[in-house]
Amino acid sequence: MIKRDPIKLFDLWYDEVLAFPFKGKDPTAMVLATCNKDLKPSARVVLLKKHSDQGFIFFTNINSRKGKEITDNPFAALVFDWSYIAKQVRIEGKVKILPCQDADEYYASRPVGSKIGAWCSKQSSVLEDRMSFLKSIEKMTAEFHGKSIPRPDYWVGVVVVPMLMEFWQEGLNRIHTRYQYTRSNNMDVWNVVELYP
């Protein structure tokens, strides 16, 4: 039976993958595909930090390559490869930057080393001297010992607001099951179809 709400279906599958005993892969890992202003694509793995009816959230340095690409072209695709439970979820949607408060809250929960890394890493830039980079981490670690570490302005939360969600489940003899959900400007109404495998 087809579920009418893809977010609820995602919740069911996500709970299943979180409960799966094999821990060799991070179930929050998702491939994020973006395009620059010339429509040249790039992809990388990021971690899902939160999801809801509003979308799928990750955090990043907005000055990184992916940050620049979502600024220039605010659309993205996500793929959750859960092959170890014979499932995959594909998402396409609009990209929005979250309010500073959301980024502040998540940043505050991060380990000290991750906070310092966010300050010291010029993500996606050429690293010409690794020793200098490591020394800058040591220096900042000493400077902020026992102190609160503020969030850099360029470290932001990003939400992918889904406009298309596809659920794929492996079947015998490659007779897989695929359900595709889409919505247009009426954000409350999802249309669902089954696709040939």
Swiss-Prot record:
Cofactor note: Binds 1 FMN per subunit.
Positions that bind substrate: K49, Y106, R110, S114, R174, I175, H176
Alphabetized GO MF terms: FMN binding; pyridoxamine phosphate oxidase activity
Cofactor: FMN
Biochemical pathway: Cofactor metabolism; pyridoxal 5'-phosphate salvage; pyridoxal 5'-phosphate from pyridoxamine 5'-phosphate: step 1/1; Cofactor metabolism; pyridoxal 5'-phosphate salvage; pyridoxal 5'-phosphate from pyridoxine 5'-phosphate: step 1/1
Family matches, as InterPro entries: Pyridox_Oxase, Pyridox_Oxase_CS, Pyridox_Oxase_N, Pyridoxamine_oxidase_dimer_C, Split_barrel_FMN-bd
One Pfam family per UniProt: PNPOx_N
Keyword Flavoprotein part of the UniProt annotation: yes
EC identifiers of the protein: 1.4.3.5
Keyword DNA-binding recorded: no
PROSITE patterns noted in UniProt: PYRIDOX_OXIDASE
Task of the protein: Catalyzes the oxidation of either pyridoxine 5'-phosphate (PNP) or pyridoxamine 5'-phosphate (PMP) into pyridoxal 5'-phosphate (PLP).
PANTHER family named among the record's database cross-references: PYRIDOXINE-5'-PHOSPHATE OXIDASE, PYRIDOXINE-5-PHOSPHATE OXIDASE
Complex and partners: Homodimer.
Name by which UniProt lists this protein: Pyridoxine/pyridoxamine 5'-phosphate oxidase
Annotated gene: pdxH
